[in-house]
């Protein structure tokens, strides 16, 4: 008995000691540090086993549990990668060798078999490779290799992929066909998830991109490439990409193959056969969007980065959209949010039966919060701090639910599976990082804290006082963390923390030496792993690998029922139609869960169905609990409006919902008649409770963004041409003004009433706020730098507490985008960064500013090159200055009410504009307008009358230096604001339209009640003018009462620039070459606007047609392939449009209710197929908008082949030329024009693809009158009577760069003209050196002799000639009677004095001279007689014509070189009308005298001729 007791005592002691040892020892993982990391691979774990695998060098290593690593395979080549098959992680892995051989194992690494060897062809590099298995068939494998060509080719693609497939698990493998050269192909098994709806597990989907043709083909094969089946859904679509997302196949198509920023459309399919386009509330552009699915796999979540390069921004904002359970109909997450939340991050699916997370910010200046949704995004709530946690450490005023947290879920967490996607699960354990709020307690050493949640993110506790990277294993029962910075925990060495009790306590393992972790790898990616591999880099750049292996932790004990506890999701409330209970391991349990996710699968108890379990059906909008309303447009797009009327179910149960006892849903009748047969035009209407004040598109091709300022001081932004709008949060302050940067199309500035400036550099997607200087806002325009978007000048009022004499403007400059301002210049009211604008500035940093001098009541112009730290005065008294093109024009005050014009092209040299003698200026020039500048010429309108409703002026044009002006036309219409009826159609060089005052004489004398206006057009930059040619019939086919042959009495007249409601509206479009629209009438002069019709030209103004009998507003779309008209000033509910260049027109009803459309707008370049109608209800103070899209009205995109022949796909080369001559400005230019009307153009750069078919010889049409010369009735240029020509060398004084000058001819070449050869009216052939430039002149003309040499040789020649001449005179003329007998000498006279042989020789010379002189005079008399006879005969030949005759010289009689006539003694142009061109052909200048009396006798009336 005593022995037995001793035995028991001994046993109990040993057991107690063992227990004490077991309790005292904490379980620790195996942590190995590998310092020889050359070609050391990451750890992988075979699922459901404790077997680990990796590679090093040429070996593959395996480890079982706590055993050591052992070699299972050694190759002749080094191993590049080893990866476990994600679909069959229990047994299969693949290994790639350095020689591109592929091996596989099917038994957890015990044995290995060769699959294939990938070889690159000559001239190719193998970049990467991958192997894919099929989740539903173990034997199916696909190997993909990515190649790049060493030498790029214009025909072959730079990179491409090849695919091989195996049907027997890799025993044999064959290529999946080969794409054509130049084609890039991507292929996937369509089965990407088990239980997929794809009919066959062998189905492969491929997309082939042809980069040269900008096309892609999508097809499927069910027999491994033996046959291909094209997808019919995309026959007329431009496919851009294909992707697989859970149960869905996603295909994106683009509206424009030539525009990388074009609108994208997404199509979804579950079976790879039937695809349906998603219904999306806005536009998707680019391909930078995130797509995830919810836990059921039915809902798709799109998170689209907002704005330019947002996908790479650190704190990018996102627009989030969630689909219904069909994956087709999307709604914006923002629609389900509290209005407090303005800015959103991407949505993440937390895989907890519908749990989603999203970061939000209440405003751009407030702290972020993270929101949770448990119902697929229909409602959201913030994350908050757990009870009992120190809220003050986070900056919260209260704890618990009052402390909302901005939790950024750890990147390691989301990528590893702590939260994860697919099969990943962690029993509700999440880790993240929190940014401390403003005013948090304690040291600010660390701005971030690491937090942990154990209830799927509802409540959070602090885990670390600094940010850590975190990782999870065994479904959250193993947690690892390492500090972002090794020294954050007070220890400079790196360490790894791990927790085995779900983050309640942490153990630390030090890593000797100073290392920083750069990569962490989990052996299994679904959250079940028990092995991890850390890569760390030391200070000396040496690397180590730290393996943390938990496979034998807790002695390998697996959890039993006693180690588990129940957790009810959402506190036991219904979620997705059921109540979910999850088995979680107790945090203190010393065990690991089985390596099987089924151990944590929830228990599901269905709930009775409610509205929350239903969603609106396809084509219905709203929420089930508030009612689902039919949207006819969406129903039509979804194909649900084929029959009429029809009954449809407004809502249905969410797919995958677990609820029972379905609701009784009554069908609704839908009348589809309104949309069944209408064209495929989309309309989106909005009603605003305020009126639009200003609106403008951003000048960018990346999207259709615009901003609106409303009357109640709100700023609205739309990125889809008005389809959706959002409001900018100005924190309660009103938006006072919106300004756009004229040089950078993505930038805009919003002035708020609290002196805050909101700036966007990405078209309104993001804004940042800056404080303006503490001065009064004067609403003066910002001045922008043309090259630096961060530099601009703001003008504020100092001493302006009260508006009085002390109040003055001050300029403040910023060079960092407004974040800091520096006071630059007091008194400045206007500045320009001229150094950034000029082509050749004297200093690129030059700024010019206008300074207001209140005391002397004048303004001063200053300039500076150091931001006005120093400056110098340019002019003492100016009216203003303006930079256009490459010129700055300054209006200088010259005494009381007198203005002069000065121009500069470099900011240093200023030249006064010189006007010709025929320019009759008013006694005091009070104003002028700078109209245009191009190709080195500037147009001015010099005002001659500022009398109200009687304003007009003279149109003048400068030479290439902007100095010497010539008159183009007098009596050009203007208004009191300085606007002028002057327009140059975009894209048409030299074409100008103006309105002239027909009754100018009566207006000048004060006898006219109103101005009578006529529209004139010039095709050669203002040299010649014609009245517009009227159409023969009106829009109803009736002839006009007047005939266009007499254009003085019958021409087309258009309302011009002075009457525009919006000055941005123009006749033309820069993208629709040759197209113009205008409102006017056919008759003697212009009628009032309401009595006019709408006219169209497609040939640059040569011919016109009436398209509507009433005034309409218009816009061009898609480079002119769409023309949209809307009635102006009357109620309407329809638009009229044409898609065939105006040949036919269709009406489209955009609304049921009639409204007055105030404006129709589109993007600045008229390249979009979307338009916005704006209506203002002035009495009710509302605005309505109608976003109209023609994006789907065409069947296809036009084919365009750059560099093709005359017929280029759907385009044809056509020329826009002078109506009377083939050449325009010395060349024949042909543009590509669409000739097939069933396609749209898009962003194909065909407008740039023009060609010059011929350079023409110079003709009279390529010249205009030079300075001081005037145009006469016969078209020649002459000096006015009494005007002396300036010295020819004066041109050298005006242009100091000139080396030579020529004798003036009265003509100068039009700067736009590119002609070569032919006439040279602008100069003689003999240049002369400019004073002081003789050296440069003779270097330029080496054949010329220098001045001293010329003098010497002339003196020598003179001496040689004078001696014999004196002898001849003395002995042959003087003593024979002198010159008095010269005309009497008879050739047979014998009374000449001859004393010797010398006398006889001299007399013979005298006789020969007499013959020569007599012959010369006789020839001249004969020539004069014959020329006079020819002129008389020419006048007789034209006398039968009606009207005055021409005065013309027939040049081929006596001109060997036409230029010889240009050097006349009277310095005029010698009455020239015709000269020889290169081909020796004659041409007539069709110049006719202006005026009603003369014009009544002519078919064509040329304007601009003034009879002498």
UniProtKB/Swiss-Prot annotation:
SUPFAM superfamilies: Oligoxyloglucan reducing end-specific cellobiohydrolase. GO terms for biological process: Golgi to endosome transport; Golgi to vacuole transport; protein targeting to vacuole. Pfam families: Sortilin-Vps10, Sortilin_C. The chain crosses the membrane at residues 1349-1369, 1405-1425. The gene is VPS10. Residues 1370-1404 are cytoplasmic. InterPro entries: Sortilin_C, Sortilin_N, VPS10, VPS10-sortilin, WD40/YVTN_repeat-like_dom_sf. Functions as a sorting receptor in the Golgi compartment required for the intracellular sorting and delivery of soluble vacuolar proteins, like carboxypeptidase Y (CPY) and proteinase A. Executes multiple rounds of sorting by cycling between the late Golgi and a prevacuolar endosome-like compartment. It comes from Eremothecium gossypii (strain ATCC 10895 / CBS 109.51 / FGSC 9923 / NRRL Y-1056). Disulfide bonds: none annotated. The lineage of its organism: Eukaryota, Fungi, Dikarya, Ascomycota, Saccharomycotina. CDD domains: Sialidase_non-viral (cd15482). It comes from the Eukaryota. It is found in: Golgi apparatus, trans-Golgi network membrane; Prevacuolar compartment membrane. GO terms for cellular component: cytosol; Golgi apparatus; membrane. Keywords: Glycoprotein, Golgi apparatus, Membrane, Protein transport, Receptor, Repeat, Signal, Transmembrane, Transmembrane helix, Transport. Residues 1-20 form the signal peptide. Residues 21-1348, 1426-1508 are lumenal. This is Vacuolar protein sorting/targeting protein 10. It is a multi-pass membrane protein. Glycans are attached at residues 353, 789, 911, 1243, 1346. Coiled coil: none annotated. The keyword rRNA processing does not apply.
């Amino acid at each position: 008995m005593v022995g037995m007791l001793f035995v028991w005592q001994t046993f109990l002691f040993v057991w107690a000691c063992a227990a004490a040892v077991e309790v005292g020892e904490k379980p620790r993982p195996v942590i190995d540090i590998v310092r020889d990391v050359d070609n050391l691979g990451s750890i992988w774990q075979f699922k459901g086993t404790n077997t680990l695998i990796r590679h090093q060098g040429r070996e593959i290593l395996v480890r079982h549990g706590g055993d050591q690593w052992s070699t299972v395979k050694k190759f002749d080549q080094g191993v590049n990668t080893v990866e476990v098959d994600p679909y069959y992680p229990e047994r299969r892995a693949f290994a790639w060798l350095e020689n591109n051989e592929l091996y596989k194992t099917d038994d957890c690494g015990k044995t290995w078999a060769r699959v294939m060897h990938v070889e690159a062809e000559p001239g190719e590099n193998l970049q990467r490779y991958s192997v894919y298995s099929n989740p539903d068939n173990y034997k199916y494998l696909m190997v993909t290799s990515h190649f790049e060509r060493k030498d790029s080719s214009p025909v072959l693609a730079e990179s491409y992929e090849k695919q091989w497939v195996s049907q027997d698990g890799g025993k044999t493998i064959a290529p999946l066909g080969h794409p054509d050269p130049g084609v890039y192909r991507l292929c996937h098994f369509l089965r990407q998830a088990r239980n997929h709806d794809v009919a066959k597990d062998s189905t492969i989907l491929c997309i082939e991109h042809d980069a040269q043709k900008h096309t892609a083909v999508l097809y499927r094969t069910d027999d491994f490439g033996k046959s291909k089946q094209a997808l019919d859904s995309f026959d007329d679509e431009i496919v851009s990409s294909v992707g697989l997302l859970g149960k869905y196949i996603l295909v994106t198509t683009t509206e424009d193959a030539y525009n990388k920023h074009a609108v994208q459309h997404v199509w979804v399919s579950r079976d790879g056969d039937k695809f349906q386009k998603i219904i999306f509330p806005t536009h998707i552009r680019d391909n930078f969007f995130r797509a995830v699915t919810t836990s059921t796999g039915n809902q798709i979540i799109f998170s689209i980065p907002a704005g330019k390069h947002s996908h790479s921004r650190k704190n990018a904002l996102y627009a989030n959209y969630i689909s219904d359970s069909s994956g087709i109909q999307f709604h914006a997450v923002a629609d389900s949010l509290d209005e407090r939340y303005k800015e959103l991050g991407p949505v993440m699916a937390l895989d907890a039966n519908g749990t989603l997370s999203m970061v939000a910010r209440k405003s751009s200046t407030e702290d972020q919060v993270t929101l949770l949704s448990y119902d697929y995004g229909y409602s959201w709530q913030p994350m908050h701090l757990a009870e009992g946690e120190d809220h003050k450490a986070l900056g919260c005023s209260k704890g618990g639910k009052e402390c909302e947290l901005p939790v950024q879920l750890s990147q390691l967490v989301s990528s590893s599976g702590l939260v994860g996607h697919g099969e990943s699960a962690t029993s509700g354990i999440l880790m993240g990082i929190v940014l401390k709020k403003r005013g948090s307690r304690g040291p600010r050493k660390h701005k971030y804290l690491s937090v942990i949640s154990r209830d799927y993110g509802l409540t959070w506790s602090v885990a670390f006082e600094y940010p850590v990277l975190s990782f999870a294993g065994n479904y959250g029962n193993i947690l690892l963390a390492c500090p972002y910075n090794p020294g954050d925990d007070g220890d400079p060495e790196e360490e790894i923390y791990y927790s085995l009790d779900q983050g309640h306590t942490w153990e630390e393992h030090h890593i000797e030496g100073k290392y920083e972790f750069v990569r962490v790898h989990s052996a299994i990616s679904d959250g079940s792993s028990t092995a991890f591999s850390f890569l760390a880099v030391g200070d000396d750049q040496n690397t180590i690998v730290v393996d943390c292996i938990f496979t034998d932790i807790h002695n390998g004990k697996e959890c039993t029922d006693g180690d588990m506890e129940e957790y009810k999701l959402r506190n036991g409330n219904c979620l997705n139609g059921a109540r979910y209970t999850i088995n979680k391991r107790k945090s203190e349990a010393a065990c690991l869960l089985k390596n099987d996710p089924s151990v944590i699968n929830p228990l599901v108890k269905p709930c009775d169905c409610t509205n929350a379990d239903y969603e609106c059906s396809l084509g219905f909008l709203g929420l089930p609990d508030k009612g689902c309303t039919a949207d006819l447009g969406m129903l039509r797009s979804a194909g649900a409006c084929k029959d009429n009327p029809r009954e449809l179910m407004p809502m249905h149960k969410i797919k995958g919902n677990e609820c029972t006892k379905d609701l009784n849903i009554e069908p609704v009748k839908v009348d589809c008649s309104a949309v069944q047969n209408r064209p495929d035009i989309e309309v989106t209407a909005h009603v605003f409770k305020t009126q639009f004040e200003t609106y403008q598109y951003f000048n960018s091709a990346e999207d259709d963004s615009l901003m609106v300022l409303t009357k109640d001081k709100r700023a609205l932004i739309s990125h889809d041409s008005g389809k959706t709008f959002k409001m900018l949060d100005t924190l309660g302050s009103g938006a006072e003004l919106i300004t756009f940067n004229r040089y950078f199309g993505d930038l805009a500035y919003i002035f708020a009433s609290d002196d805050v400036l909101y700036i966007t550099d990405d078209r309104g997607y993001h804004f940042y706020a800056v404080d303006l200087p503490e001065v009064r806002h004067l609403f003066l325009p910002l001045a922008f730098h043309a090259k630096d978007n961060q530099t601009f000048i703001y003008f504020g009022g100092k001493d302006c507490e009260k508006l009085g004499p002390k109040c003055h403007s001050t300029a403040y400059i910023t060079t960092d985008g407004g974040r800091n301002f520096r006071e630059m210049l007091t008194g400045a009211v206007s500045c320009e960064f001229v150094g950034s604008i000029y082509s050749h500035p004297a200093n690129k940093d030059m700024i010019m500013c206008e300074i207001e001098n209140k005391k002397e009541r004048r303004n001063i112009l200053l300039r500076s090159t150091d931001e006005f730290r120093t400056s110098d005065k340019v002019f003492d008294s100016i009216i203003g200055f303006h930079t256009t093109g490459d010129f700055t024009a300054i209006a200088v005050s010259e005494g009381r009410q007198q203005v002069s014009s000065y121009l500069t092209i470099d900011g240093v040299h200023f030249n006064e504009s010189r006007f010709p003698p025929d320019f009759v200026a008013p006694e005091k020039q009070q104003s002028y307008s700078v109209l245009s500048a191009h190709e080195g010429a500037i147009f001015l309108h010099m005002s001659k009358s500022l009398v109200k409703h009687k304003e007009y002026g003279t149109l003048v044009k400068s030479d290439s230096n902007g100095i010497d002006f010539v008159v183009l036309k007098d009596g050009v219409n203007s208004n009191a604001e300085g606007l002028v009826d002057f327009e140059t159609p975009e894209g048409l060089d030299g074409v100008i339209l103006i309105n002239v005052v027909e009754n100018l004489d009566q207006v000048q004398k004060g006898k006219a009640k109103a101005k009578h206006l006529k529209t004139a057009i010039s095709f050669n930059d203002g040299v010649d003018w014609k009245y517009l040619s009227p159409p023969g019939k009106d829009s109803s086919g009736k002839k006009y009462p007047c005939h266009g042959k007499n254009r003085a009495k019958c021409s087309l007249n258009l309302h011009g620039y002075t009457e525009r409601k919006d000055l941005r509206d123009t006749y033309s479009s820069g993208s629709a070459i040759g197209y113009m629209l205008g409102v006017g009438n056919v008759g003697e002069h212009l009628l009032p606007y309401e009595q006019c019709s709408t006219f169209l030209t497609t040939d640059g103004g040569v011919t016109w047609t009436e398209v509507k009998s009433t005034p309409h507003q218009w816009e061009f779309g898609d480079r002119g392939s769409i023309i949209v008209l809307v009635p102006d000033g009357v109620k309407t509910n329809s638009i009229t449009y044409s898609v065939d260049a105006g040949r036919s027109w269709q009406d489209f009803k955009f609304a049921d209710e009639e409204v007055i459309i105030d404006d129709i707008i589109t993007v600045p370049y008229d390249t979009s197929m979307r338009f916005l109608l704006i209506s203002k209800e002035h009495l009710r103070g509302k605005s309505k908008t109608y976003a109209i899209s023609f994006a789907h009205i065409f069947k296809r995109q036009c084919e365009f082949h750059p560099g093709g022949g005359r017929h280029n796909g759907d385009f044809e080369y056509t020329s826009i030329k002078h109506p009377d001559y083939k050449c325009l400005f010395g060349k024949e230019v042909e543009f590509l024009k669409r000739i097939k009307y069933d396609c749209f153009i898009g962003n194909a750069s065909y407008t740039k693809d023009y060609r010059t078919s011929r350079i023409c010889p110079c003709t009279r049409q390529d010249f205009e009158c030079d300075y001081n010369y005037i145009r006469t009735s016969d078209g020649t240029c002459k000096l006015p009577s009494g005007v002396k020509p300036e010295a020819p060398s004066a041109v050298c004084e005006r242009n100091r760069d000139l080396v030579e000058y020529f004798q003036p001819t009265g003509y100068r070449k039009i700067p736009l003209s590119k002609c070569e050869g032919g006439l040279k009216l602008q100069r003689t052939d003999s240049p002369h050196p400019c004073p002081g430039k003789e050296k440069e002149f003779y270097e330029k003309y080496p054949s010329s002799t220098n001045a001293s040499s010329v003098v010497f040789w002339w003196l020598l020649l003179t001496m040689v000639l004078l001696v014999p001449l004196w002898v001849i005179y003395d002995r042959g003329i003087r003593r024979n009677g002198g010159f008095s007998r010269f005309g009497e000498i008879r050739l047979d006279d014998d009374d000449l004095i001859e004393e010797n042989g010398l006398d006889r020789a001299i007399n013979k010379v005298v006789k020969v001279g007499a013959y020569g002189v007599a012959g010369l005079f006789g020839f001249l008399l004969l020539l004069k007689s014959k020329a006079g006879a020819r002129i008389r005969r020419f006048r007789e030949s034209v006398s039968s014509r009606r009207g005055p005759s021409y005065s013309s010289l027939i040049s081929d009689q006596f001109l060997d070189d036409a230029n010889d006539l240009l050097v006349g003694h009277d310095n005029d142009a010698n009455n020239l009308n015709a000269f020889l061109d290169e081909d020796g052909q004659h041409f007539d200048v069709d110049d006719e005298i202006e005026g009603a009396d003369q014009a009544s006798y002519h078919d064509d009336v040329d304007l601009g001729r003034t009879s002498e």
